[in-house]
Amino acid sequence: MKWKKSLTGLSSYKPGKREEEVMAELGLTKITKLSSNENPLGTSPKVAELQANSSVETEIYPDGWASSLRTVVADFYQLEEEELIFTAGVDELIELLTRVLLDTTKNTVMATPTFVQYRQNALIEGAEVREIPLLVDGAHDLDGMLNAIDDNTTIVWVCNPNNPTGNYIDLADIQAFLDKVPSDVLVVLDEAYIEYVTPQPEKHEKLIRTYKNLIITRTFSKIYGLASARVGYGIADKAIIEQLNIVRPPFNTTSIGQKLAIEAIKDQAFIEACRTSNANGIKQYEAFAKRFEQVKLYPANGNFVLIDLGIEAGTIFSYLEKNGYITRSGAALGFPTAVRITIGKEEENSAVIALLEKLL
């Protein structure tokens, strides 16, 4: 086959191990998955009720415009419906962005380490990837990213909070950054974990009307607990949305996914409960880190913590796995002596911390 040359050297995305796989390998009867940043509290009771009582006409194509969901989300953020695009998770939106803006003559700027799909999709399009190392505390080097922009730059990626470090850039710094980015360079502000930030930042969706080169990406996969429903969305100027819709598949979000997302966003009481539970979980890990001088905990603002124990990452990962907890080794994330752990329920956090204390 005459494959694209840009695929040479690339490999497919490797998701975390499945619970069943680990249990079979290690002979365990119970496993807790804390590797994919899923919501340990599940999803809204209203979503569960809809799932139990909903019937889907599987022979009928879904609404390609996601009309009902579009109206609800637009009302929620006080936006115009044409300022939104819905995709099969943010993953698909990232793919669409690289497809419309990158080719072999262009380059893109991002932090490293950050969410791996920015780089992967850029390389598939044959673009040059300019990676700017994070600062020592895990924060974006925004000045370094600005300096990397040139006439051939078309996209700058900012993951906020950043995955895998958890660092959060406040709104004032984001605006100062946007003020300096050329108006013909798209800034992707990936806010997959924004609902977990405590306290919640000031509403800033309407920044897209000041910065016509900004797209904000969000998802129903994280705090809303709809990871398997695959519903993400982008907020941007209408001109950006129009270009993305040219390459967006016509029926890319499912009927049931759209319905579940509507119920999920309506139940903000559940979201607040998830945010509070998550903040308490972060405090558990912060207290643990304070007890051990050799432990470095990166600033946590998502639903995960990145912990450097000064021990080889594979050793930490295997140790926790053998004791019934799947985490994410930092080795593949650019942190050879760290692990990324999804914040779980209080008792799950306590159990993991107790295991880490024994390891130290």
Curated annotation (Swiss-Prot):
Gene Ontology terms for molecular function: histidinol-phosphate transaminase activity; pyridoxal phosphate binding
Keyword Glycosyltransferase assigned: no
Protein name: Histidinol-phosphate aminotransferase
Family in the record: Belongs to the class-II pyridoxal-phosphate-dependent aminotransferase family. Histidinol-phosphate aminotransferase subfamily.
One Pfam family matching this protein: Aminotran_1_2
Keywords: Amino-acid biosynthesis, Aminotransferase, Histidine biosynthesis, Pyridoxal phosphate, Transferase
GO BP, one annotated term: L-histidine biosynthetic process
Entry EC no(s): 2.6.1.9
Cofactor: pyridoxal 5'-phosphate
UniProt pathway annotation: Amino-acid biosynthesis; L-histidine biosynthesis; L-histidine from 5-phospho-alpha-D-ribose 1-diphosphate: step 7/9
Record field: catalytic activity: L-histidinol phosphate + 2-oxoglutarate = 3-(imidazol-4-yl)-2-oxopropyl phosphate + L-glutamate
Subunit composition and interactions: Homodimer.
Keyword ATP-binding among record annotations: no
Top enzyme class: transferase
UniProt xrefs under NCBIfam families: hisC (TIGR01141)
InterPro entries, per the entry: Aminotransferase_I/II_large, HisP_aminotrans, HistidinolP_aminotransfase, PyrdxlP-dep_Trfase, PyrdxlP-dep_Trfase_major, PyrdxlP-dep_Trfase_small
In-chain residues carrying the UniProt-annotated modification N6-(pyridoxal phosphate)lysine: K222
